[in-house]
Amino acid sequence: MRKLPLGLLPVLIFLAVFFAAPLLINLLESLRGPDGARGIAQFIRIFGDAYYLAVIGQTLLFGLVVTLACALMGYPLGYAVARAEGAFKIVLIFVVVTPLLVNVVVRSFGWLVILGGSGAINAAMRALGLPQLDLIYNWLGVGIAMVHVLLPFMALSVAGTLETLDRRVEDAARVLGAPPLRVFWHVTLPVSAQGLITGCILCFTLSIGSF
């Protein structure tokens, strides 16, 4: 049986004190009722109320949709980052992380300018003689903004795992006659699955927490 490296001990102590302990305290406090008695009556009341169940269901559905959108767009973006070289790779990484560098107020105002009734999209719709779209103050607008913020987490997670893939393995599969789709499905995707799963977990937890 392998022993735990002593170098991990400070990290584990830090996580226990500043992460695990507060979560445990919050859990214990959530069991305390108005009269000070502990029990699960509060949880029974919440999960027995249709309103709270609807809120929880909408939150989980929103998180799933945002995570799926991030996966569909973030995987190709992460693949491009992993395969890029030289100065183009640096530029591409900068473009990917830009949403995380912009202040939330500036970012929100930017989306209002783009998606609002007088924004660029609706201005183009009016110019084409098409009806105006309702893109803000609804699920769609929030989802678009959330995907914009969380996409870097997905792309960088995928790119990080693809960086570990030896391209000679893909080349060997092609030399043996495997078509590009088969190479991706049997070689590239399994290697990047860990990064994809990590990105999905990050996007899902952050999206439901923000929503």
Report the location of each language-model feature:
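Short glycine/proline-centered loop/turn elements that form peptide/ligand docking sites
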Residues: 165-169
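Membrane-water interface segments at the C-terminal ends of transmembrane alpha-helices
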Residues: 2-34, 50-163, 187-211
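Conserved acidic donor-binding loop of glycosyltransferase catalytic domains
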Residues: 183-184
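Glycine/proline-centered hinge or cleavage motifs at structural transition points of membrane proteins
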Residues: 176-177, 190
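The alpha-helix within a helix-turn-helix
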Residues: 173
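Short coil/turn motifs that cap or connect alpha-helices
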Residues: 131, 178-180
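A short amphipathic helical element positioned immediately N-terminal to and/or at the very start
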Residues: 38-47
